[in-house]
A protein has these predicted regions:
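Expand to "…catalyze enediolate/carbanion chemistry for C-C bond making/breaking, isomerization
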Residues: 1-210
């Protein structure tokens, strides 16, 4: 995956010339604000997936347009630059509505769940774990890493654990056995959204060969 310079920089045209390289799987476009720029990247790359990085007020305002842009696989949230552009002194609570809005835009555009921004604390694995689990609860599908040693924690937190898999299996089995009748698992009613969640967990577990 290659991150190019922003479309309004002097280096962007030269970056476009590199995008057809066969070793590039996808392209990250920072400071993404216009669907037209995303389309330019997509075409220059020979049709590779593009991940617009939302890092500004304008980019956030254009989130649905960017999510629908040609070649977009998923959005990503650059919350540090976003805070600077918004003159925010934000904690995670203040950023919550912006994160949820990106998840919603991704769903409305029928693209993959977005990728959350980095955790800058390099030596705090617990803070990283908290950040990743929050992102997963909100509906994000991944998280940017600022250092290679963060990858293990991020992958682990986005991977269904044994308890989740066992719960999902119980839900699917109970729903099948009920034959359309009301059923409960672990004392909680199982309805269509619960079944869909269980199916998603098992699909992810299968994709990760768990």
């Amino acid at each position: 995956m290659l991150r190019v310079n922003a479309a309004d920089t002097a280096w962007f045209p030269a970056d476009l010339e590199l995008l057809a390289h066969p070793g590039i799987a996808a392209v990250v476009l920072p400071k993404a604000e216009h669907a037209e720029d995303v389309a330019v990247v997509h075409r220059a790359s020979g049709g590779k997936p593009v991940l617009p990085l939302i890092e500004s007020a304008l980019g956030f305002e254009q989130r649905l347009s960017l999510a629908h842009a040609e070649g977009v696989q998923r959005l990503a949230f650059g919350h540090i630059d976003f805070q600077a552009d918004m003159n925010m002194r934000a904690t995670e609570d203040e950023l919550l509505p912006f994160r949820v809005a990106l998840v919603l835009a991704s769903r409305l555009a029928d693209i993959a769940p977005p990728i959350d921004g980095v955790t800058t604390a390099l030596d705090d694995a617990e803070l990283l774990r908290i950040d990743v689990l929050r992102a997963r609860r909100l509906g994000f599908g991944g998280k940017l890493c600022i250092h290679p040693r963060q990858v293990v924690v991020v992958n682990a937190c986005f991977t269904p654990d044994a308890d989740e898999i066992a719960w999902a299996q119980r839900v699917i089995a109970a729903d099948a056995a009920a034959g359309g009748a009301a059923v409960a698992v672990d004392g909680k009613m199982v309805d269509r959204p619960v079944v869909l969640r269980a199916q998603a967990i098992l699909a992810e577990a299968a994709a990760r060969k768990l």
